[in-house]
Amino acid sequence: MARYRCCRSRSLSRSRCYRQRPRCRRRRRRSCRRPRASRCCRRRYRLRRRRY
C-alpha cells in the first residue's frame, strides 16, 4: 500500500513521487493487475512515454 500512496496523493508532486518510489515503474505488470495500483501505473507510464 505504501508504494501507491505517493502516486495517489495529490499533495506530493509527480517528480517527487518518481524519486521516492521508482518501484512502481519496475513492477508495473504485477502492480497494474490490482485495481488500486492501476491508476498509478497508468499515470506513470503515460508520463514516461511523453517524456521520452
Swiss-Prot record:
One of its GO terms (biological process) is chromosome condensation. Keywords: Chromosome, Developmental protein, Differentiation, Disulfide bond, DNA condensation, DNA-binding, Nucleosome core, Nucleus, Spermatogenesis. It is found in: Nucleus; Chromosome. Testis. One of its GO terms (cellular component) is nucleosome. GO terms for molecular function: DNA binding. It comes from the Eukaryota. Belongs to the protamine P1 family. Protamines substitute for histones in the chromatin of sperm during the haploid phase of spermatogenesis. They compact sperm DNA into a highly condensed, stable and inactive complex. Cross-linked by interchain disulfide bonds around the DNA-helix. This is Sperm protamine P1. It comes from Alouatta seniculus.
